[in-house]
Structures are given as structure tokens and as C-alpha cells.
Amino acid sequence: MLLPKRTKYRKMQKGRSHGLSYRGNSVAFGEYGLMALEPSWISSRQIEAARRAITNYVKRGGKVWIRIFPDKPITRKPAETRMGGGKGSVDHWVAVVKPGRIMFELAGVREDIAHEALRRAAQKLPVKCKVIDREEQGTMATDQEVSSESE
């Protein structure tokens, strides 16, 4: 599972997720990408499950890039513990994902195999996703901004 080797601080505040992803919102390495359509936290276990789903479907062909990294620690206090006594210990790590973020990329396989592999990976993730090609990514950013402004 993915987690940072070392961090400056052990614990982090929750924060708020709003707006679109302006970084990592285009297919940079592969031919096909899996784009998040809504904001969420994605745990390292979910990232690993999605990665396994992709590699299992494409077998030995193709190359997979994971474009998100779980660098936010989530703390949890033990069960049946009274309030207070400080912040709990780190339980797991998550990646903060905003709408428009490319989470996985795939290259070296046919289009139908890539779409099915990324669709299977999307089923393992807690966000609505869309499979995009390198060619259609230019129009996606403008579509995303237009749809969010109308709501």
C-alpha cells in the first residue's frame, strides 16, 4: 500500500474540498485516463484495489501510471473512548481528489481493453469517474467548468 516515507508533521487537519482540480487534470503519460467527476478522499487501499483491477484485466500488456498519492493522514481514536485526551493516532492515509483530476493512466493496450480496465478500476473507487482519451481531454476541461457554473 502507498504511504509517505516521512512527513514534516504526523497529523493533519481535515480541510475543506471545493473547486476543480487545476493540477493533474490532463492525460500526461498514457493514452487513456480515469478522471474523477466529484470530490472525495481516496484511501491507499482503494488505490491499490483499483490498480490490481487494471493490471489483472490487461494481463501482461500495457503500462499503468498512478497519478494520485495518499499523503494525508487520517486519525482515529480507539472504540469506546471518551471525548478529549487529544487527537487520535494515525489510522490510514488518503489522497484528496477534486473533480477533473486524472487518477490513473493506461497505455500500450487496445482501446476496448483500456476502457474496460479503467471501468473496472472505477468500480473500486468511491467517486463517479469518466474514462477519457488523450484526444478528448481538451474539451473535457471546458465541459467540466461549464457544468459546474450552471449548478
Swiss-Prot record:
Gene3D superfamilies listed in its UniProt record: Ribosomal protein L10e/L16
A cellular component term, taken from the record's GO annotations: cytosolic large ribosomal subunit
Keyword annotations: Ribonucleoprotein, Ribosomal protein, RNA-binding, rRNA-binding, tRNA-binding
Top-level lineage group: Bacteria
CDD domains for this protein: Ribosomal_L16_L10e (cd01433)
Function: Binds 23S rRNA and is also seen to make contacts with the A and possibly P site tRNAs.
Homology family: Belongs to the universal ribosomal protein uL16 family.
Name of this chain's protein: Large ribosomal subunit protein uL16
Organism: Chloroflexus aggregans (strain MD-66 / DSM 9485)
Gene name of the record: rplP
